[in-house]
Amino acid sequence: MAKALSLTIFLFLLIASNVQSARLLDEVQTQPQLVPQVPEEEDDSPQAVTTTPTPIPLPGPATGGPEPILEFFMHDVLGGSHPSARVVTGIVAQTEVNGIPFSKSSNNIFPVDNAVPLVNANSINNLINPNTAPLLTGLSGSQANTVIQNSNGNSQGSLSSNNLPFVTTGQLPPIAALQQLMFGSITVVDDELTEGHELGSAIIGRAQGFYLASSLDGTSQTLSLTVLLHEDHDHHDTLDDAISFFGVHRTASHASHIAVVGGTGRFEHAKGYAVVETLHNQEDQHVTDGHDTILHFSVYLTYYKA
């Protein structure tokens, strides 16, 4: 009896455990699906950055930029006993001079047909004298009374010395304006350069070149100059520190801008520009019997050999 009861209880418990196991097996818990994470690809292509260029103002007095790298004063002396400027082409008053070289043949000089005579010491007084030399006004753009000379046709003492003669206004054609006579005249210069404009200022070099009257109204001079800065050494024995300029100097304006086109020495391959100002009412600053025009150069360089 006891064994039958024990067997019954054992079977009951066995069946109950099987039922519980089957129920647990049927209840499958839903597992979350694992999705592999793919790393984001980095964009290696460079990003285009748009920047607006900022304009760089040119240095100079108008923009309040840096100070000029160099300043000097050029003295252009016309006439007198020691001129630094001489005319080489231009209009003269007498038509005989306009005919040089002559179109007529002369057997007195060349014993051949159609020869062209040369000017000699005997004929020079009849051709060129202080009253037939070209008219100049210089870099100041205005004619000075001290420049015009008249020695009544006498060339002695003028052509043989450093005096530079000029025509008088009475010899000019009545219908020709002064500006029209100036137009096209070329003047070569070998002017002194000083540190300041005042009397006795130290000489730092020379300006050599020429200027051309390039406007019909007489207010423009085309400059082509090379400034030689020898300062404390002999510029004939050493390489000069030189700057070359080219541009138009407008005598009617307060200041003009001309280009720096090159240089030598420490200014080799120089680039930039110069502001040129004409100093007025400076006639009594220097001892000279000619007309001294003073130009103030302020040089601004964007590149030069230090």
Curated annotation (Swiss-Prot):
Gene Ontology cellular component annotations, sorted alphabetically: apoplast
Biological process (GO), any one: phenylpropanoid biosynthetic process
InterPro entries hit by this protein: Allene_oxi_cyc_Dirigent, Dirigent
Gene3D superfamilies in the cross-refs: Allene oxide cyclase-like
Cellular location(s): Secreted, Extracellular space, Apoplast
Signal peptide: 1-21
Keywords: Apoplast, Secreted, Signal
Domain of life where this protein originates: Eukaryota
One Pfam short name: Dirigent
Disordered: annotated segments: 36-61
Task performed by this protein: Dirigent proteins impart stereoselectivity on the phenoxy radical-coupling reaction, yielding optically active lignans from two molecules of coniferyl alcohol in the biosynthesis of lignans, flavonolignans, and alkaloids and thus plays a central role in plant secondary metabolism.
Subunit and interaction comment: Homodimer.
Family, per entry: Belongs to the plant dirigent protein family.
Protein name: Dirigent protein 24
Protein's organism: Arabidopsis thaliana (Mouse-ear cress)
Upper taxonomic lineage: Eukaryota, Viridiplantae, Streptophyta, Embryophyta, Tracheophyta
